[in-house]
Amino acid sequence: MSTGPDASEQGAYQELQCYTLAHGDPAFLHQHVLDAWVAQHAGAATKPIGLTFALAGLYLHVDCGFSGRQVQRAHMTLGQRKRAWPTFVLPVERGAVRVRQVLAAPPGAARDRAIAAWCGSVWGAFHDSRTTIAALLQEYDIWPSRNGRS
């Protein structure tokens, strides 16, 4: 559902942020959590740049295999010039996986896999935005082949 998070969900998100920030993984898993959360909870008050960056991050991670660090670099590239950011139709359902389910997974590999599943679930809900996101990233020369992916 596209309604804002309740206090329990917000608390779970904050706890998951603490987990990913303390993770110590150089791949920077935290970026994927930010992107999934923003896209899943976007609403009328969400700025186009925020949703664009979140969807770009999810596309690069889920479809192209980018690490959180690579997504972070892509966000920096996108932010280098001012522009009008695209607007997206917000799907009613934003993915079946929720942050509380991710946090319920045991810390470590299981939770990291749950984060990946959450990202895939949210990105799948925005499948109609894929062409717009891919074209935007190509415009900025942010493309899988640039990072050793085909």
Where are these predicted regions, by residue range?
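Intrinsically disordered, low-complexity linkers and terminal regions
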Residues: 1-150
